C-alpha cells in the first residue's frame, strides 16, 4: 500500500471506529461505502475487510461480557444455523457479482449492472436503518422490563423453545431461524453485522430485554464474524494490510467515540446517529450520480 492509501485507510477506520464508541453499534453500514467510494476498493474486497475488521471489535466485546459473567446465550446458538445459511447465500451472491460483467443502460448511459445494483441495495438498507432509528425514537423500550412481550409472541408456529433470555417464555424456532437468515445475508453480502436490525428485532418482535438483546447479538456476531472472515479469506476477499490499518484507525476512533458519548444525551445521540445515516446515504447517492453522469 502507498502512503496515501495507508493514511486513507487509517482515516476511514478512525471515522468508522467512532460509531461503536458513541452509539454502541458497528460501523459496517458506513465502512463498505467509504472504502468503495473514497478509497476505490472493490465492493467484494470492502465487504471481506469489513467482516475481518468487525471481528476484532466483537471479540473484545465478547471477552468483556464473559468477564462480566454473561452466560445465558442459548438464543445466539439458535440464531446461528439460520445466520450461517444466510451468510453463505450472501457471500455466494457477492461472488457472482464479482465475476459479472453485465452492463445496464439508463438514459443513454452504460453502467456496470452489479455495482449499480449493489449501491441501490445499500441505499435501501440505509432507508430501513433510518426507519429503525425513527421507531427507536418514538417507542422507548424500558430496559428493566424483563416481562415485555414481543409482537411475535402470539405466533404459535412450532416448534417453540423456552429460553432463559425470555425468562422461561417460549419462542418459535422457525421465526428465530428466519431472523438469523436475514442477518446472515446482510453480513455475507453487504458486510453489515446486523446489530442495527437484530437488536430492535429481538426487543420488539421477541420481547427480549435490551440488555440481553445486546448480549445475544454480540455473541451471534462473534460466531458469524469468525465464519464470515474465514469464508471471505478463502475466496480472496480479505486484504490483510488494509484490515490492519483499519483496525488501527478503528481503535483510536472507538476511544474518541467513548469520550464523546459521555457528553451527549440520548436524544442528541439519536440525532447524531441519524446524521451519520444521512451522510452514508449521501456518499452512496454521490457514487450513483457519478456513475450516471459518466466517469
Regions found by a protein language model. Give the residues of each.
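Juxtamembrane transmembrane-helix boundary motif
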Residues: 1-12, 67-182, 204, 234-295
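Structural signature of hydrophobic alpha-helical transmembrane segments
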Residues: 3-5, 42-56, 184-189, 218, ...
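Transmembrane alpha-helical segments of multi-pass membrane transport proteins and ion-pumping complexes
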Residues: 13, 17-25, 29, 57-62, ...
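Juxtamembrane transmembrane-helix termini in multi-pass membrane transport proteins
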Residues: 26-79
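Membrane-embedded alpha-helical segments in integral membrane proteins
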Residues: 27-41, 96, 105, 127, ...
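Interfacial segments of multi-pass membrane proteins
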Residues: 31-45, 197-212
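Conserved glycine-rich helix-kink/hinge and helix-boundary motifs of the Major Facilitator Superfamily
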Residues: 47-48, 214-215, 274
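Hydrophobic alpha-helical transmembrane segments of multi-pass integral membrane proteins
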Residues: 215-228
